[in-house]
Every structure is written in C-alpha cells, then in structure tokens.
Amino acid sequence: DARLRTDFNITTGIKSAEIEKFKRKSVMKTYYQKAGIPTARWCVTADVTEAQAFAKTVGWPVIAKPDNGVGANGTHKFKNKTELNKFFQQEGPNAANYILEEFVDGEIVTFDGVADANAEPIYAASHVTPDSIMEIAHGKKPMWYYVAPEISPELRKMGEAALKAFGAKSRFFHLEFFRLKTAKPSLGNAGDILGLEVNMRPAGGYTVDMLNYAGGLDLYQIWADMVAFGAAHHPLARYHRYCCCAGRHDELRYRIPHEELLKKYRSCLNAAPRLPEVLAREMGDQLYIASFEDEAAMQAFRRDALARLRE
C-alpha cells in the first residue's frame, strides 16, 4: 500500500520512503527507543571480532536474525564462541544482513488492531505466545498461543507510544513485545515489557479470526470503516473472551484422539483447520481454535489438545 500511495500521491498513510522503519529490525529498535520503550541490546556487523565482543558483553546465548525478515525464518541461537564463529565463516560478508541480539527469556505479547489517521488505535487487542517462536518453528515446542480478554495498562501505554513513534497512521498494526519470565540486570525484572518487532499489517495465520472470535467483532470491517470514514461504524468488542490455538503433528500420538477432542469441545471450538505442508512443519498439521470465558477452562483444553501418549 505504501507503493500505491507513492505512485498516486495519496497522503493518508505511509509512503515508500518511510517503509524502512517497518522492514529492518535494527531500525525498529531506534523507534522503540524513541517511544521510551526498552529493547534487548543488539548490533549489526560482518566482523566476527566485533560479534565476539558483543557476545562477551551481553553473555551467551546470542540470537541472530535476518535484519530484513519475518517470523522465525533464518533465526539462529549461538550457545558459544565456536557456534558464532562457524556462522560468520559460513555467511561471510552476508553476516552484515543479520542483527545480533542478546537472548531474552520471555513470552511474546502483542498489541494488535487498527489505527486511525492520527496513529491512535480505533480498536486494539493482544495475544500471548508463552513459548519461544524459534522453538515452535524448529519443532521443539507445540504450537500454542491465545488472545487475552484484556490488555494490561502497561502494554497499552507502550503500544500506543509505539504507534505514535512509528507514525502508524490509517492501517493495521501488529506490534510485538517481550514480557520477561525471569529478571536480568541489563533488561529488567520478571514481568517487565521490552520492544521486539513491529509489523504494519494484520497478524498472521488465523490470528485475525481469533481476535474476532474473542471479541465478537469483524476486524476487517473495522479496517474498512477506517478507510472509508476514519472511525468504526460497526460494533467493537461485544464481549471479552480467551481464544486459543493449539497445533498437532500427524506423526505424533496424542492421548485424546482427534474425533474425541472435537466431540468433547464441540460447544467451544470455532474451527479445526488442516494446514498445508508448507506451514505444517512449524505449526502442526491440525489446528484447533477454541474460545473460553475463563483461563482455567482454556488451560484444560490446552492439556487435552496437546497431551501425548507415552511411547
């Protein structure tokens, strides 16, 4: 949409010259800092000596991600100097296209929604991914995340500040943050929130559907209202529920078979889609999306959906 605005001189949103801050993680960090939001320490370099010095400063492990990329694709975790050196030997000058970050032990919390022409949220919600996206993508953890019924005041404050700093006008937004699981002197206390990445688009996968199920709304209709009228002309959240997503892999055996799980949770399930092979390796072949009024019921579903038979 930035290219279209540039080509036709449409002044209601982002143009091509401004897009870099939404594409490169290293640039995103500076805008988070502009908003007063702390981030993990980072560096971009093709010099292995500089990378080693960075690792010595922040401690192991160290994370490397494509500076211009989405999701967990191309993400590496280095536990020691040998692994870091091997990466730089393999990548050569291309290593400068990666951003190195200190490791953060945290769950991902988001600020998702639609912003108006003043970079203020018309509607916002949040989803939580307790496990590392990298571990999910590499098959070490099952796919599991959920939309929360409320946004914490701290997260809302940071999300709104980030929208202003990035100039996120008249668009969908999907802002990612870490919420620390454990204290770390350089980062903060358990529960503190750090800026991670921004995406000026709807959240991926079935997340928009989950936001709709959780709130009883139509987020794409709200976006269309924003484009046409500058504000929502249709109902915002009618209720505040949890909506979760669990993923199963076909090659694994689960304690509760598929059909039995569908029957047990038929009143709560919103959808049970099969994923194409290109997505199944990371997310699971079979997804279950369900809504609940309280967290205890949602966690019971999580256990039933993901519990595996002992081999």
Predicted regions and their residues:
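Short glycine-/acidic-enriched loop or helix-start segments at secondary-structure transitions
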Residues: D1-R3, N73-G74, T207
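A short, GP-enriched loop/loop-strand-helix hinge that lies immediately N-terminal to
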Residues: D1-R24, G36-V44
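ATP-dependent carboxylate/phosphate-activation module, predominantly the ATP-grasp catalytic core
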Residues: E102-A168, F172, R179, A183, ...
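Alpha-helix N-cap recognition
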Residues: D47, F78-T82, P257, D294
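Peripheral (often C-terminal) accessory segments that flank ATP-dependent C-N-forming ligase machineries
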Residues: I222-E311
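Structural element of the ATP-grasp superfamily
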Residues: M28-Q33
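Conserved ATP-binding module of the ATP-grasp superfamily
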Residues: P38-A40, T57, P61-A64, T75-T110, ...
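Short glycine-enriched loop/turn motifs at secondary-structure junctions
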Residues: G36-P38, N68-A72, R281-G284
